[in-house]
Amino acid sequence: MGQTLYEKLYNSHIIYEDKNTLPIIYIDLHLLHEVTSPQAFESLKNKKRIVHAPIKTFATMDHNVSTKTNKISASGKAAQIQMQQLINNCKDFNIKLYDLNHINQGIVHVMGPEQGLTLPGMTIVCGDSHTSTHGAFGTLAFGIGTSEVEHVLATQTLKQARSKTMKIGINGILKPYITAKDVILYIIKKVGTAFGTGYVVEFSGETIENLTMEGRMTICNMVIEMGAKSGIIAPDATTYKYLKNLPYAPKKEKWKNALEYWKNLKTDNDAKFDKIVKFDVSQIEPQITWGTNPSQTINITESNPDPKKINNIIDKQATEKALKYMNLKPNQKMINLVVDKVFIGSCTNSRIEDLRIASKIIKNKKVAKTTKAIVVPGSKLVKIQAEKEGLDKIFINAGFEWRLPGCSMCLAMNDDKLNRGERCASTSNRNFEDRQGRGGRTHLVSPITAAAAAIFGYFVDIKNIL
């Protein structure tokens, strides 16, 4: 019987296995940031261990950095300590670090792919749940905890149980105003936040094939929000074109050899998945979250659910709780709902394609006087490219704040936060209670919907303004 792409990746990286323990797999790339690495390095030092493969370990600063200045001193005390520790640890263990003054600095899941560090066939780990983003390149990529960070630093290996396999087929030509963000929110709405628990999900189908690498990364980034271990998309011509000539991508003869290998990274025709799901997304509309988890999503023209019409007591109580936190009423329309802030950024939607499509919406327009809007490029290279194209001027002239790279308002771990009661149109990946700031209310949307909300000061049906 044939193998799925996940099985090929997993099996080819097993370096030890017996019936009494979990298999041990080799890790090809280990990405670090300032938040989940300090304890791991401290433990290494206490045990007088070295980093096994510094050449396969790369670090950047992203989670708690200020996006207003590239000075560490602009962040809080705890953040300053974490960043300084990362500098010291990378120096002590000879690890490449893209610090705040480095041209390659950025969000770890933006930096890795754009440097060509993320290559098909790899196993990739990082102390961050959205490491699944890299699966868009045909890699087995997943987040790990701090103790596992230490283990990979010390051994370049990890004990890892086999996951179940799921195939999600996505077909249909998207409407011109629909993005990958709408697609993945739609799927999470349909299946829920626990549907993928225990699975690695392979995405395939016409829609996936037509997406850019940026769109594919958005899909794999948010597979975690349906409970999956990771997401994978088989590499193809789109992947190869993106990777060619990137700094760490293979060159010359090595490129030819790599292509031959990469073209075999696909699920065999006779492979068996544990679960198969199919979606037709040709008719979907812009998606928006109304509640406090990504599955609490509706079409932007729809109304919020009414708890009285929900029979399941658990779902009913969850709906009541979410509506209360979000200060929304049952059956309330999302259209015309006023937003206080707009955030375009995060490892989900901060790449050059995201900034381009948002800039088209706001060009020659002005941000509503009642709304504060910020755009945070995912990396310095994204920022530089956007400025070459004049996108920064479009955003600034419209009234957006044009920031430096970082995770920013995706999470309340830096100085970009929501105040209590503020409502935000956000292109990030999580809308949990207090995620963007204590008492803040997050609505997950695409860059197009977010840009439109900034101009009007409230949510609109994008079809009506194109």
From Swiss-Prot:
Enzyme Commission designation: 4.2.1.33
Gene Ontology BP terms: L-leucine biosynthetic process
Membrane spanning residue stretches: none
InterPro entries, A to Z: 3-IsopropMal_deHydase_lsu (IPR004430), Acnase/IPM_dHydase_lsu_aba_1/3 (IPR015931), Acoase/IPM_deHydtase_lsu_aba (IPR001030), Aconitase_4Fe-4S_BS (IPR018136), Aconitase_4Fe-4S_dom (IPR036008), IPM_dehydratase_rel_enz (IPR050067), IPMI_cat (IPR033941)
Sequence positions that bind [4Fe-4S] cluster: 347, 407, 410
Keywords tagged on the record: 4Fe-4S, Amino-acid biosynthesis, Branched-chain amino acid biosynthesis, Iron, Iron-sulfur, Leucine biosynthesis, Lyase, Metal-binding, Plasmid
Cell division is among the record's keywords: no
One Gene Ontology term of the molecular function aspect: metal ion binding
Cofactor(s) essential for the protein: [4Fe-4S] cluster
One protein family per Pfam: Aconitase
Functional pathway: Amino-acid biosynthesis; L-leucine biosynthesis; L-leucine from 3-methyl-2-oxobutanoate: step 2/4
CDD domains listed in its UniProt record: IPMI
Note on cofactor: Binds 1 [4Fe-4S] cluster per subunit.
SUPFAM superfamilies referenced in this protein's UniProt entry, alphabetically: Aconitase iron-sulfur domain
Lineage top rank: taxon: Bacteria
Catalyzed reactions: (2R,3S)-3-isopropylmalate = (2S)-2-isopropylmalate
Keyword Cytoplasm included in the entry's annotation: no
NCBIfam families: leuC (TIGR00170), PRK05478.1 (NF004016), PRK12466.1 (NF009116)
Function summary: Catalyzes the isomerization between 2-isopropylmalate and 3-isopropylmalate, via the formation of 2-isopropylmaleate.
UniProt subunit comment: Heterodimer of LeuC and LeuD.
Family label: Belongs to the aconitase/IPM isomerase family. LeuC type 1 subfamily.
Protein's UniProt name: 3-isopropylmalate dehydratase large subunit
Encoding gene (name): leuC
